[in-house]
Amino acid sequence: MAFDEIYRKVPSEQVARLKEFRLNHPYKQLIVGDTKWEYLSCGQGEQTLLLLPGALSVGESTFPLITAFENDYRIIAPSYALSLTMAGLCRGLANILETEALNQAHVLGGSYGGLVAQYFVRQYPARVRSLILSHTFVLTPKYAKPLWLAGKVFPAFPQSLVAPILKLRLNKMLLSTLSNANHPETEFWSAYLDEAIASDLLKEVFIHQNKCLLDLAHQRQLTSDDLKGWPGKVLIIESDDDPAIRVRDRELLRSTYPKAQVHTFCDAGHASSILKREEVFLIIRSFLHNVVQDV
């Protein structure tokens, strides 16, 4: 389906912003071993933000954060290379930072990106200045069985069935919250997700994510002791009605980072970065400012 057709219901100024972003933020490429990585590198400033995307796995999906922070921070926003373990993903991220001559970064991960961020700080603690975890959780062995089942069933689905399944999942996680709030960007994000779903690549992305998560579910669970020697600070952003992160999972995340600064939104679902965008950005800016000032 053509771009103009997908975005036909979206206000013209919102479409124009996306087109302008894509024009001004081309991807860079890096080969790590046998794997090709793509990432956005932009912005300015002495501090660096490493933005780790969620379910879509593409750096561009973090563009609201990029445009909000690129005037004050160096920004690295990678697209995850597929067919890698979580260890391979983290190794690739470290290589990107090294290639860009960046010793440290404030790492921000939302949803699936929050999982990547948690493993990255454990594998490369010296690379992480601070950690921002948004709408995410700690993987536990209880997820192994449903992940195994999904890994058996989902790859066999034809694209004609994959598209509505992904749309239903993303609608539950994001679009229904925006629609219920009558948010002015509801049509934009619906179209943006439709554009992603229209690509056959998204099926491969979800298969890859499932394999990574299943592998991790069989490994030792992350604990608060893992980062005892790490001097960085942690910010947790969550919502009291997140349909993707259950209450006990939010509690486990907080107990895994007992010294973290926590901000809990009300009635923001899995979409606080859209519904409460300005407040979220202010919270992040304040946190980053305090991290730098405390040195």
Which residue stretches match the model-derived regions?
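Catalytic histidine-centered segment of alpha/beta-hydrolase-like enzymes
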Residues: 244, 265-281
